[in-house]
Amino acid sequence: EVSKFLFQRNIVFNPKDAKSYLYLAKIYNLEENEKEELKNLETTLLLDPKNEEAMYMLIQIELKKSNFSEVKDLTKRFNSICLKFCKKIKDIEQKLKDAQAKEASN
């Protein structure tokens, strides 16, 4: 709770701090508050379009929702910006294949 408050306060004083939005998204992820997590990830990417971690987290949310077309689009964007998280692309692609196969068999 203290961390969340500090990041929220930082946003009040520095509304363009993408890292605060990212860390809030992580906190909301732990709290399983997907709506707030998504909102903060989108703000992070608005302020810092090349933020790999936010993009990866957003892809995970869309995979969970079975929003495969969005996952494909986000993965293309992720491919173009990745530096540190490039190894995660194969993981995303495998999860997408598995989810699509599972949905097709239902």
Positions of predicted regions on the chain:
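Canonical positions in the second alpha-helix
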Residues: 10, 43-44, 77-78
